[in-house]
């Protein structure tokens, strides 16, 4: 009897919703919408598409429907653009119109409904947060202030690998050590602190919470409840876990880092030995002036833990994997550094501009294995036109940035890992968005400001490793597995492979 009642209730809801949608369409504004599959009432195209909206699946739809298409996912409009011309329109020409961020039930939890910078809507709060975060994080002065620390952390990785006897025989999962390096690089900038080892209890706790946050946020498991509000009650358990993880992370940031820095400030100078403040000092200054509140401070820390640490780590891991699988390219990188810098001279940040082949390897890694292949989703607040089509207000706009430089119509043999392309036919292309066929960091007002940190960190880390060790697949294998794992808008390697690292002798 209960089952029969449930079936009748669901059927009644379905019929009522169908009627409501039909009436709304008859009475509402008539749009010329982008092409796409025909949706069914309530569910839209969700039943056919499913939850996994990764960059490769969306590329397949672009091949069917064109450079702009619309997926009606439940009650959400999802517009995907897949050409350089339309990417320019969204990110540059109409950057104000498309400059907001879409809401999401899970990201609302992790960002306090947009109290951060990355996921807030376009407006005064975003401008304020961007300004407050730029000085302590995203300027050349920051690069010059902290580059010695980055070089020291990379040197520490090299020494640990060289001193690990197993590394040169059976191999090690080098990603674990690189993860510690990335945390130390960013926590030096944020708090003038570092973790001594992978076993540091605070590091273990922090890494676990950040990992759980990433898993929950990047999963496609919750899409159905985000797309179809009447199904949201089924997400109750998932959202409860998200809130618990969010609360534990923010409490950890507050207790162990922000409050500790405040205590130091009350007892002694918080400037470093060279008289320069770390990032949290600048942010707390803004808080004292009343520009931001306590929660904003914590959500800034939240953004850096995710946006800066994870994405750069993924790119380093991808770069190493490609060099392991392309020994000829690895040898060319090594030969260039030996020739230009001299054998044994460890690469530094000022050296990077002298090493065009190393730079080309980094660009090629970001092209083929883009860490954020769909960029961070955009949203329009009104009803603009795009390529002659009407885009309904509050649509989720995805730029398939991965497809732009992997489309054979625009790039020569894009499926190949070939750094030479950036020294030959694509020598003018940079990672800063000067060519709309290649946007690893986006472009325009909502582009990733972390480019100024990511590129030198990638160059120093990959350069130091290649200089000092031969990176090889494990015994019995000719290559390592580079299968992808895509998330809501992330792309990282599926399996953290074991890599043999044989020390070089100079």
Curated annotation (Swiss-Prot):
Disulfide bonds: none
A GO molecular function held by the record: iron ion binding
Origin: domain of life: Eukaryota
Chain ranges passing through the membrane: 3-23
Keywords: Heme, Iron, Membrane, Metal-binding, Monooxygenase, Oxidoreductase, Transmembrane, Transmembrane helix
Function in brief: Catalyzes the first oxidative step of the phenylpropanoid pathway in higher plants by transforming trans-cinnamate into p-coumarate. The compounds formed by this pathway are essential components for lignification, pollination, and defense against ultraviolet light, predators and pathogens.
Designated name of the protein: Trans-cinnamate 4-monooxygenase
Gene source species: Medicago sativa
Gene that specifies this protein: CYP73A3
């Amino acid at each position: 009897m209960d089952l029969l009642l449930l079936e009748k209730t669901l059927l009644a809801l379905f019929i009522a919703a169908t009627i409501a949608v039909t009436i709304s369409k008859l009475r509402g504004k008539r749009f010329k919408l982008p092409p796409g599959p025909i949706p069914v009432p309530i569910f839209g195209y969700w039943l056919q598409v499913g939850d996994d909206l990764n960059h490769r699946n969306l590329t397949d739809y672009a091949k069917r429907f064109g450079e702009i298409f619309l997926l009606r996912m439940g009650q959400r409009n999802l517009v995907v653009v897949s050409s350089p011309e339309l990417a320019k329109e969204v990110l540059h020409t109409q950057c104000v119109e498309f400059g907001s961020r879409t809401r999401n039930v899970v990201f609302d939890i992790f960002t306090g409904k947009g109290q951060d910078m990355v996921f807030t809507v376009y407006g005064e709060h975003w401008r304020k947060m961007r300004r407050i975060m730029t000085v302590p994080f995203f300027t050349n002065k920051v690069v010059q202030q902290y580059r010695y620390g980055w070089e020291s952390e990379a040197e520490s990785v090299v020494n640990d690998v060289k001193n690990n006897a197993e590394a040169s025989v059976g191999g090690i999962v080098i990603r674990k050590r690189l993860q510690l390096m990335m945390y130390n690089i960013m926590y030096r900038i944020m708090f003038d602190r570092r973790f001594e080892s992978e076993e540091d209890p605070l590091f273990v706790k922090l890494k676990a919470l950040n990992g759980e946050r990433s898993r929950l946020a990047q999963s496609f498991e919750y899409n159905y409840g985000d797309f179809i509000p009447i199904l949201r009650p089924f997400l109750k358990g998932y959202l409860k876990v998200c809130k618990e993880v969010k609360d534990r992370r923010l409490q950890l940031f507050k207790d162990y880092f922000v409050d500790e820095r405040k205590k130091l400030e009350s007892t002694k100078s918080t400037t470093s030995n060279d008289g320069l403040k770390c990032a949290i000092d600048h942010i707390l200054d803004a808080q004292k002036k009343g520009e931001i509140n306590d929660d904003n401070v914590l959500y800034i820390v939240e953004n850096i833990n995710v946006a800066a640490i994870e994405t750069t780590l993924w790119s380093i891991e991808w770069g190493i994997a490609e060099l392991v699988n392309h020994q000829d390219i690895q040898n060319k990188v090594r030969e260039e550094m030996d020739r230009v810098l001299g054998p044994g001279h460890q690469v530094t940040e000022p050296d990077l501009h002298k090493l065009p082949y190393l730079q080309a390897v980094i660009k090629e890694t970001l092209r083929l294995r883009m860490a954020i292949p769909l960029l961070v989703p955009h949203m329009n607040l009104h009803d603009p036109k795009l390529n002659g089509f009407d885009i309904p207000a509050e649509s989720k706009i995805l730029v398939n940035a991965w497809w732009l430089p992997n489309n054979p119509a625009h790039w020569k043999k894009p499926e190949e890992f070939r750094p030479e392309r950036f020294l030959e036919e694509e020598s003018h292309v940079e990672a800063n968005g000067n060519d709309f066929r290649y946007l690893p960091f986006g472009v325009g007002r909502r582009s990733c400001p972390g480019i100024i940190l990511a590129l030198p960190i990638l160059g120093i880390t990959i350069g130091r490793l290649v200089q000092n060790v031969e990176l090889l697949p494990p015994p019995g294998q000719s290559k390592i597995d580079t299968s992808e794992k895509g998330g809501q808008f992330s792309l990282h390697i599926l399996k953290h492979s074991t890599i043999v690292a044989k020390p070089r002798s100079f």
